[in-house]
Structure formats: C-alpha cells, structure tokens
A protein has these predicted regions:
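Short, conserved catalytic-motif segment at the N-terminal edge
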Residues: 3-63, 83-85, 101-108, 392
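Hydrophobic (often cysteine-bearing) scaffold residues that line and stabilize catalytic clefts
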Residues: 9, 13, 63, 67, ...
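Active-site SXXK
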Residues: 17, 37-39, 62-90, 192-200, ...
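Short, well-ordered beta-strand elements
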Residues: 40-42, 352, 357-358, 364-373
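Acidic helix-start/capping segments at beta-turn-to-alpha-helix junctions
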Residues: 91-99
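Short, surface-exposed loop or secondary-structure junction motifs
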Residues: 101-341
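Short, hydrophobic/aromatic-rich segments at coil-to-beta transitions
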Residues: 341-347
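Generic C-terminus detector
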Residues: 373-396
Length: 396
C-alpha cells in the first residue's frame, strides 16, 4: 500500500463518515483524501431522503463558498494577462463603486457618513477588506435594512438566487455607504460577489464563460458550473436544512440549478463534483500546475488579515490562520495555536452547504468533503470536525 495513509486509518475514516449518514446527519456525502500520491474516496448515503439508490462518486453538489477560491483563480489569470493589477482601483471597471462614503459607525443612519480616504482596490475586494460585507446581527442596523430592501444578500449562501442581474446588483451596492474605510477591516462574503462581477467587466464576457474557458476546461472540470444541464440533473443532490424536526428540503434537482441564474454569484453559486474539486485543489498544490503561475499562487496564499481581524472573526478563522485572496490561509503562528485535531488546517475554505476543503502544506494532506446539509453556523459542524480528525489520523 502507498505510504500516504494507513489501511486501518482509511477504514476508520469510512466508518466515521458512513456513521453520520446512518444516524441521519446527512442523506449522503462524498469525501476525498489525498496524500503522497494516494487518493481515497468515500461515498455514503443517497442524493435525497427516501432515495434507495446509492450515491455515486459523480454526484453533483452545491459547493457554496468553495466557489470563492475558484473565482479568485480567474481574477489571478486576468492579472497574469495584464488586464488589471491588485493595486488598481476597481472603479475603473466598476464605476458604481467610485466616490464612496463611509458610515461613521455601524449603527449610523445612512446619511451619517464621511468620505472614503482612498479608492477601493482589486486587492481590497479579493481580501475582503474593501469596506462592506456580512453583518452578523443585521436586524440592528439601518444599513442592513437598506441592503435587504434593495435585494442584496450578503449573509449565507446565495439561496434563493437573486433576480438581480450583475449590473443591477452592483448598482444596488453602489447606493449604500461602506461600513469601513477601504483596506481597514475584514468583512466576509460580499467581496466575492463583487469579484465575480469584476471578472465579467474586465473580461467583457459572462463569469460562467470566463470560468469555463480559463479554469474548467484546462483542468478537466466537466461538471462544474452555475447550473446543471438537463442531461445531468439526475446526478444533482437535493439540499436540506436541519431543524428541530429533522431535515427539511430546501432545493431539489429541478429547482434553482435547473437553469442559469440571473446573477452568477462568485460568493457561492457553483455546483461541482469531488473529482472536479480535486482537479482544482491539485492545481494549487502543484504551485499552479501550469494554469496559474507560482507567483499568483503565492499571492493567493499570503495572509492579509490583522490581529484585530482574526480576533473579531474567530468564528470564521478559528485558531488556525487568516485570509489571503478569496480563501483561508494558514499563518506562521497557526502550528502553535491549534490543539483540536478536528480544526481545518491549511489553505482552502468551507461552504454553507456543509462542504469543506483544505490542503495542508505541513503534512501534505488534502481533504475535500461535499454534503447536502446546510450549515447552521460559520463554525465547523460535528461532521466536518469528525472528517478532519479521522483524515489526519489516517495519515501514515
């Protein structure tokens, strides 16, 4: 057997994951671990409650926020083309974000603002420090009420999909003041939607087309996109929301993903398979793998957060690191911080559909898990913690 994992460890990993399906945590899942050239895939359960057919390795899942690093890679490709740079003001392509004003404090009325001290840059957007993002207690703030009235959704995955087009969405954001001065504070999520629209404006083509031609086709990601074609809908898993009475169906195979969305959302709109995700993660692990340059990968994995960002957003970062460009990254101190074997380590991210991916350069372990159960918190679920604990224990 290859040296990446122990046979007993992989058996224990399979038992752990199938156990969560057996107890009803999720209807089904597909997980992959890879180390030292050895790949092991676990499939368990079915694609929907009440479906007696076993889930296949080619099952299609809503990957939610695992979309973010993929869109980040597309931006880096455009940077390599010379079409834009990290230090460029985004208003060159997104004039809706020019001349920003900033709330004096988060609970201020919308007209209680001051001028932005500088323009928003491409790096600000990709590092989630452009001045706007998820408000964790939205009911308390006038700006959150205005956001909801416009139809923007910055908390959680983009479900149900917005009826707004990319142009309408960015125009709506442009009508709101920023929450912080550009470049001063990390706020989750919204930067990824902006990044997707930025790709469209810079490339002069729809985001779905840019991703297909620049990322998916070169990497052989044949089942990844913003909707599922008719001939593949039978492979799309159903999505469930956990509650006191068990799992409630949120979206089925012929629901939101049966047709292209009005807004291809860079924050969480993609569907994919375990093998497509492995192709993307392997590209990054190979320092770009011939798609991205080594320098682009280095820039994506460079932590941009401050200690204040880490403290304020501990629910996102845990004790493991910070944020690079469109994904979580390990920090120098991360190795001495963690005591929980289930904490995701390395670079990657997690999704609101229960998905998780990390590549840990320290151990060479890559793990990916795709599920169909919506998260109830930004913190890792019990299933996610158990997956990472078992995956690490399986390493030889």
């Amino acid at each position: 057997m290859a040296a990446g994992f122990t046979r007993a460890g992989l058996a224990a990993l399979d038992e752990t994951l199938t156990g969560h399906v057996a107890t009803g945590t999720v209807p089904g899942l597909v997980a992959l671990v890879e180390r030292d050239g050895e790949v092991h895939v676990t499939t368990a359960g079915s694609k929907a409650l009440g479906d007696s057919k076993a889930l296949g390795r080619d099952a299609i899942f809503r990957i939610a926020s695992l979309t973010k690093p993929i869109v980040g890679a597309a931006v880096m490709l455009l940077i390599e083309d010379g079409a834009l740079g990290l230090a460029d003001p985004v208003e060159k392509w997104l004039p809706e974000l020019a001349g920003r004003r900033v709330l004096r404090h988060l609970s201020a009325d919308l007209d209680d603002t001051m001028p932005a001290q500088r323009a928003i840059t491409v790096e600000d957007v990709l590092s989630f420090r452009f001045g706007f993002g998820t408000i964790m207690s939205p009911d308390h703030y006038p700006v959150a009420a205005a956001e909801a009235e416009i139809g923007l959704k910055t908390l959680g995955p983009p479900w149900p999909p917005t009826p707004l087009s990319p142009d309408e969405w960015i125009a709506g954001l442009g009508r709101l003041p920023l929450l912080d001065q550009p470049g001063t504070r990390w706020r989750y999520n919204t930067g990824a939607t902006v990044a997707g629209i930025l790709v469209e404006r810079v490339a002069g083509a729809p985001l779905a087309e840019v991703l297909a031609t620049r990322v998916f086709e070169p990497l052989g990601m044949t089942d990844t996109g913003f909707h599922v074609p008719e001939g593949k809908l039978h492979r799309l898993t159903s999505m469930y929301q956990p509650g006191a009475d068990g799992l409630t169906l949120v979206d089925g195979p012929r629901g939101w993903y049966a047709a292209p969305p009005a807004l291809p959302d860079g924050s969480g709109g993609l569907v994919s398979t375990i093998d497509d995700m492995e192709a993307f993660t392997a590209m990054l692990a190979a320092d770009g793998g011939g798609l991205l340059s080594t320098e682009s990968v280095r820039l994506m994995l460079l932590d941009r957060t401050t200690e204040r960002d880490k403290t304020e957003n501990a629910v996102f970062f845990g004790d493991q690191g910070g944020w690079g460009l469109m994904m979580a990254v390990p920090t120098e101190a991360a190795g001495s911080r963690s005591t929980d074997p289930g904490t995701p380590r390395g670079y990657g991210w997690d999704g609101g559909s229960g998905t998780t991916w990390r590549t840990d350069p320290a151990t060479g372990l890559t793990g990916i898990m795709l599920t169909q159960r919506m998260a109830t918190s930004p913190a890792p679920s019990a299933l996610t913690l158990d997956f990472w604990t078992a995956a690490r224990a399986a390493c030889a």
